[in-house]
């Protein structure tokens, strides 16, 4: 009896902690973060380089450090041609610096400039010229598509916008359903604990496991959406330079922690009724005599 009660109380406590962690993750804006300080410093150094006639600027990528094609065998020639093809379609430093990259942090609802990472952006925010945070759209809008592009590229961007929109909707929708199911399971578990009903405790555990499943779907969809945004075409519009560091923030880890606590609480609440002994009644069982029950 004591072991079952301990499992039940532990499961309900972990479920309550999981609800708190998921609520913090949903309300915060640190699911995904970027740091563009190195890129900004490199672009400043590139724009302030010497341009006088007596100075010759030679990029490291153009230094003659490779052998001639006549001395390469067939396999090395293929590798060299593939590398030349990649360099042909890659962005030059001037093209990368022509587009402004900011240090941002993003959540389910907003995308914000990170505080203390860009003094120029911070000054514009203090003046009120730009907003620190912008809300993420969950509806399709053609205003975000550039106008001066070819028809095929515009069609590809439009299709990618719909796909990214579906991924964002799935992430927010499944996360909301997960929190609602876990909250409903916690209420059922508390009522089952007060009324000493093993079936209600078992149902609460199943609801916790179901909520954890929805949470897994939401987090996996969020990761897939971020990877899709980074691999969109054309790369010069949606890709990130190599010197911009990016990764998941503490909100994402808070959501994964809530997922783990939800699954553990579901296991404990499902196991608790089987540990408790079956209540015995003081009334004797009726026995059949001559085809009738006495």
From Swiss-Prot:
It is a multi-pass membrane protein. The chain crosses the membrane at residues 172-192, 206-226, 252-272. It holds the Pfam family Claudin_2. The keyword Transmembrane applies. It comes from the Eukaryota. Residues 1-23 form the signal peptide. Disulfide bonds: none annotated. InterPro entries: PMP22/EMP/MP20/Claudin, T178A/B. The keyword Membrane applies. Keywords: Glycoprotein, Membrane, Signal, Transmembrane, Transmembrane helix. Glycans are attached at residues 148, 152. GO terms for cellular component: membrane. It is found in: Membrane. Belongs to the TMEM178 family. PANTHER family: TRANSMEMBRANE PROTEIN 178B, TRANSMEMBRANE PROTEIN 178B-RELATED. This is Transmembrane protein 178B. The gene is TMEM178B.
């Amino acid at each position: 009896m004591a072991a079952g009660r301990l499992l039940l109380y532990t499961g309900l406590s972990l479920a309550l902690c999981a609800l708190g962690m998921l609520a913090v993750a949903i309300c915060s804006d640190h699911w995904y973060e970027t740091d563009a300080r190195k890129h900004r410093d490199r672009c400043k150094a590139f724009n302030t380089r010497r341009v006088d006639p007596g100075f010759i600027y030679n990029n490291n990528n153009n230094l003659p450090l490779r052998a001639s094609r006549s001395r390469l065998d067939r396999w090395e020639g293929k590798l060299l041609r593939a590398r030349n093809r990649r360099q042909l379609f890659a962005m030059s430093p001037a093209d990368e610096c022509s587009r402004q990259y900011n240090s941002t942090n993003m959540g389910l609802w907003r995308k914000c400039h990170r505080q203390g990472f860009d003094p120029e952006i911070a000054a514009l925010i203090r003046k009120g010229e730009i907003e620190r945070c912008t809300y993420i759209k969950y509806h399709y809008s053609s205003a975000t598509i550039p106008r001066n592009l070819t028809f095929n590229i515009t069609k590809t961007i439009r299709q990618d916008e719909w796909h990214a929109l579906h991924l964002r909707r799935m992430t927010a929708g499944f996360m909301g359903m997960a929190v609602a199911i876990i909250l409903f399971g916690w209420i059922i578990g508390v009522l089952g604990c007060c009324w000493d009903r093993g079936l209600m405790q078992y149902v609460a555990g199943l609801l916790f496991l179901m909520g954890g499943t929805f949470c897994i779907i939401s987090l996996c969809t969020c990761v897939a959406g971020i990877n899709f945004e980074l691999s969109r075409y054309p790369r010069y519009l949606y890709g990130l330079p190599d010197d911009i560091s990016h990764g998941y923030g503490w909100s994402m880890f808070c959501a994964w922690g809530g997922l783990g606590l939800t699954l553990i609480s579901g296991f404990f609440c499902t196991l608790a009724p089987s540990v408790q002994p079956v209540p015995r009644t003081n009334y004797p069982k009726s026995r059949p005599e001559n085809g009738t029950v006495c």
